[in-house]
Amino acid sequence: MLILLILYFLFLQLHIFDSFIKSIMYDIYIHYAICKFIFLLEIYKLIAMGKRKGQRNIASMKYHLYNKILNRKSFPAFSVMFDAGVESVLPTPLENIQIPLGINTNYGIAYASIISSLLSALNNLAISVFNPNFNSQTFLNLGQSANFGISNGISLLNNYTSLYDNYVQLCNILYQPAVFDETYFDLSVYQPALATEYQNQSCKKIEQYFSSLTTTNVSVNVTTLGTGITNIPNVDNYMYNNIADTGIIDLLNALNINFNQLPDFAKFIIAFIPDLNSIINNGFALDVGWLDRCVLAPETQNGIQLQNGMILQYFADVFGMILDYTPLDFAVLMPEFNPENVTQDDLIAILSADKTVISIFGNLFKMHLYDPSPGGINIAYSSEIENYAVSYQQFLQIQKIVNKKYSNIWYAKMVASATIEIARYPYQQNYSYTSGKRTLSYQDFLNYWKTKWKFYGLTDQDLQYAQQLGEQLQGQAKIENQIKLAQKSAKTKQYKPIFYYKNFQNIAVR
């Protein structure tokens, strides 16, 4: 009996011990599971919330895109970027306009492509006359067709204008009627008419065609560019004197063409060139940051005053000049209205007109990324697009340096942005044309720079760090100036475009 009691006692102790062990193991298991969960949660936070984006940030994506363009791998990418950027460069008050469903505000952009392509066609004509041995292989590298002769001007106009008229008629208003679809069991479902969907798809295809016009290598016969010929001596003399010092008069003389015998439309296009050339020559520069700036800033005596205190000359004049000289009746785009009683339709019309004007200028800017191009001595090696790539590459370098110093990602981004403003200050932007006052003096710039970034929350110590780091990197901008100067100097000795002044000495020659 005693033995049984002892055995029972031992069994009970073992059972209690086993339960105790199991309890401890269970607690350890629960503790391990909790720790593992917390660890995984923290890892997730590091990945999802605290991870620096690295190669996925905006600057990196832009840099890689520009780098592809620089390497001739995907040149049309810039065109896509610009077309998407038309919305972003609209003036701030127009950004908040609520456009009703079905209203198309893009049909003016199609017209902008026509104006730009005509200027490009005239420039191609000048190239074929002045540079008969010009290597057309550049076009093929850019995905453009080679030059296969001179197109008839009136045929070119008829093709453009008939397509444009059809586009406006078809796509001015994109209706989206709701029709009941009996095949759906849910009686609340309404579908747009199938024909309307096809029509809208057709409009998109026509828009794609217009966007391709500016990349088409077409030369045009200027004597057939129009039908009617009207001789008004005062007007003709004014236009002739206006082109006297430009490359267009050399082109007419080389072709043995009398200006007064040209069709009216050809006279308009020719008169358009020196005015645009004059504006560019007087200080407007195709520099790195124009797409990021407000395009309708208030005018000052020397140009327009941007919000950051910089002066950009004659930018707004480009838009006014295009509106003044354009042959298109803009009444449809920008009708007269009472400024004290502006309706939504008025605002939509203004929005359409602004998008048109911005597109005309933007398409001219795109042409500067081709070689040959109106505007001239640019881009044999895509030097303008190289500036974009270099800027974003430098920003990434600065960002990596700053990230090691600051744990707060967003604060580090501000320090990096402040640093690159200092680093890029010596870059002189534009060597193609004479240019006036471009920016503040360095000391005035530093005063403005410190005030701005203090307002954004940077401390004096961090501003001093950003200034020192930026000034250490200013040598890169100076080297870029030397490289660009050498490129322009070599190019101006052999290339003679339509946009140039006779006896003009650019900075490469001076």
Curated annotation (Swiss-Prot):
Q: Does the keyword Electron transport apply?
A: no
Query: Domain of life of the organism in this record?
Result: Viruses
Which intervals of the chain form a coiled coil? none
Keyword vocabulary terms for this entry = Host membrane, Membrane, Signal, Transmembrane, Transmembrane helix
Transmembrane regions: 28-48
- What are the record's GO terms for cellular component? host cell membrane; membrane
- Outcome of mutating residue 415 to I: In strain: Isolate variant XX
Cellular location(s): Host membrane
Q: How does it sit in the membrane?
A: Single-pass membrane protein
Where does the signal sequence lie? 1-19
Record keywords: Nucleotide-binding included? Answer: no
State what protein this is by name.
Uncharacterized protein 510
Q: Which organism is it from?
A: Sulfolobus islandicus rod-shaped virus 1 (SIRV-1)
